[in-house]
């Protein structure tokens, strides 16, 4: 399923049941460089976890920023741990931050034909400031003007703090 974003970006959605959870996988196209929104786009992957028993309830969202940097979000293999507890009150959104997991990766191929300065410049697009811009784009397009809760672990805690500093009303 494809949807148009508010800003013209495309969102792909795949929804399925796993264990006692309803999983919705999203792929969002966002600018590599937010100063050049018409330029190159990258894909940001996010997975929504919703307990099957709450499928028809309007639960608020909780976005989770993973630690690292450089690690993808956790993959739910069972209805347990912090995800189980959080999913009792929220739709949990697990974000693969830019360059990680199922989002557009950073790999050796990313740097083919680049000199050291070009590589350093390219990597600046994968910092916390752009990770939180991605999250805000996703929030605006997924839940519009509604607010969500934010949780982060390790580097993800830094991203959560950064997000709350830049988007305190989100």
What is the role of each PLM region?
Residues 13-170:
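Gly/Pro-rich cap/lid or specificity-loop segments adjacent to the active site
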Residues 1-10:
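Short, Lys/Arg-enriched N-terminal segments with co-localized hydrophobic residues
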């Amino acid at each position: 399923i494809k949807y148009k974003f508010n800003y013209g970006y495309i969102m792909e959605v795949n929804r399925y049941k796993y264990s006692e959870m309803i999983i919705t996988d999203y792929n969002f196209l966002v600018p590599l460089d937010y100063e050049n929104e018409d330029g190159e786009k990258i894909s940001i992957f996010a997975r929504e976890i919703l307990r099957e028993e709450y499928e028809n309830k309007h639960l608020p969202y909780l976005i989770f920023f993973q630690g690292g940097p450089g690690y993808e979000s956790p993959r739910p293999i069972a209805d347990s741990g912090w995800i189980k507890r959080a999913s009792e009150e929220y739709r949990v959104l697990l974000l693969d931050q830019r360059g990680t997991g199922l989002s557009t990766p950073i790999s050796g191929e990313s740097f083919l034909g680049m000199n050291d300065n070009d590589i350093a410049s390219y990597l600046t697009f994968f910092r916390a400031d752009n990770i939180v811009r991605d999250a805000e784009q996703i929030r605006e397009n997924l839940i519009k003007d509604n607010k969500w809760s934010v949780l982060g672990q390790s580097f993800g805690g830094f991203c959560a703090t950064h997000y709350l500093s830049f988007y305190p009303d989100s």
